[in-house]
Amino acid sequence: MDKETLDLTLEALRDFTSARLPEKKILELDATDEFPIDIVRDMNGPELGIQLLFIPEEFEGMGGGAFDVYRVCEELARVDLGVATGVLATFLGSDPIIFGGTYEQKKKWMTRIGQEGLLMAYGATEPEAGSDLGALRTTASPEVKDGEVVGYRITGNKQWISNGGYADLYCVLAKAPAGPTWFIVEKDADGLSHGKPEDKHGIRASNTATVSLENVYVDVDRMVGGKEGQGLFQAQLVFGYTRLMVAAFGLGAGWAALDRAIPYSTGRIQGGAPLSEKQGYTHKLIIPHAVRLEAGRAYIEETAERIDSEEGTLNTEGAIAKYLSTEAGNGAADASIQALGGYGYTREYFVEKIKRDARITTIYEGTSEIMEMTICRDRWQLHLKTKGSYYHEMAQQIEELQRQNGNVGAHVVGHCLHGLAELLEMARVNRMTRHQHILFRLGELIAFAEGAASLAKRAARAAKGELNEKAQRRFSPEALAAISRIYARDTAMKIVSEGARWMGGLLPESDGGNLGARLRLPEIFRTQEGLIQDMDYVADVLYERDTA
């Protein structure tokens, strides 16, 4: 998809949502716990055709890539995460077919989804099988005729299924004799039923329901890929891509909240001046969250470009993007409630709804804790495989960036990456990863360090005018450089403080004395100079004050 087509798609989406989903309507849907099925179906209709975005051009779709999907998902989340989840369910439900189906299956089902605007549901999760899909209990028993398998009988229960009560098609993961396998099930199949909608904390404009399958028969040509036992492999093929979508949801929700807090603070007078002019307000409740969101954006965009360049599934990168962006979005929404004070706690002012909605992004498509485990498990293997050089080499690459552009905080990121490499080596030598909590905390530090590297690279590209032509351009190159410097400093302090906290207490006394030197503590302390000035500058940018 070219830039012009993406821009037209985003413009059409904004026109549609402003007409059909004004703020009053969104609050009504939230209050009544109503899934706006007509609106969601119309989004798949001729006027907008949002489902065409992810369908390949050869099957009469728009052939959008990961970058296009990220931009659209962020825009959807800015409007309403519940409705966005209904759209995501069709994207997600189609993925096993797109990435694992036979050509004939892709042609048949993708064409139907595009032309008929079918809603889909992704039927993987079960009461006893959430992130651990290997524990699923739904079974698919072969039906044999004349010695050949002609179909399957599927029996089991699925839970937390988005669009579960309204989908036209379900992609269902079930255990066949050769292992977990995806099957395509139509809504009118005998034995298929759904429960009442879940009464949820947030995303109340989405439909989430249990789905039950009791001896549901499907023909053998509904087995995705035409071969049993490929289900978990096919699911793994799309995690990098689908987690990028949820990362974009966190980004959109977080900025939607901050973009309500920022104008509120310009008109709210306290102590004779607007809140927007008080560092105690902006430097706690606004700036840190804007910075973290933009770090998430940098990692999303870098990963999306790599997926579109067919570098591979990038599951770990998808996990980092999701972790950084959804935690940042959830934090920004929470801070926005505080930023509005008592008004923020009331439904009328919207930010409390955004907070309730944003919370799910840290849970669905893999909890933040699963992301921490996934991130550390993969990068730990790279640390071992490279004999400890993986992050030292990444630091050297970033230090080269510092020589090219000394304004984006790349030298600070270099300290972060060298320190991270030392932490991982200490953990190896002292066998600290036998403590699961240490493993998870390392996953967090890895995500922040790689996010800092990605943001520095994005700021440097912006300075050279080399951002992706489809990239979001809210901030000038100068503002991005300041944002990158802030995030690099914050990450450096996080690695030092968290590393000292968790490693220092477990290291032998003989090794504890040089911990500060190995983590580059003196250098990192010196990099904190200028932090307040950079935060002041970013505040001026966000509040559109003179930055000359």
Regions found by a protein language model. Name each.
Residues 46-107, 111-117, 163-169, 293, ...:
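Internal helix-loop-helix
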Residues 25-31, 265-273, 293-324, 337-340, ...:
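C-terminal helix-coil-helix/basic helical segment that borders enzyme active sites and/or dimer interfaces
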Residues 409-548:
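C-terminal amphipathic alpha-helical interaction region
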Residues 150-194:
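A short core secondary-structure module
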Residues 4, 8-9, 78, 194-294, ...:
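Glycine-rich beta->alpha junctions and the first turn(s) of the following alpha-helix
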Residues 1-87, 107-108, 112-115, 147-148, ...:
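Amphipathic, small/basic residue-rich leader segments at the start of a protein or domain
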Residues 72, 343-409, 503-548:
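Glycine-rich phosphate/cofactor-binding loops in nucleotide/flavin-utilizing enzymes
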Residues 116-124:
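A short, Trp-centered hydrophobic/proline-enriched beta-strand micro-motif
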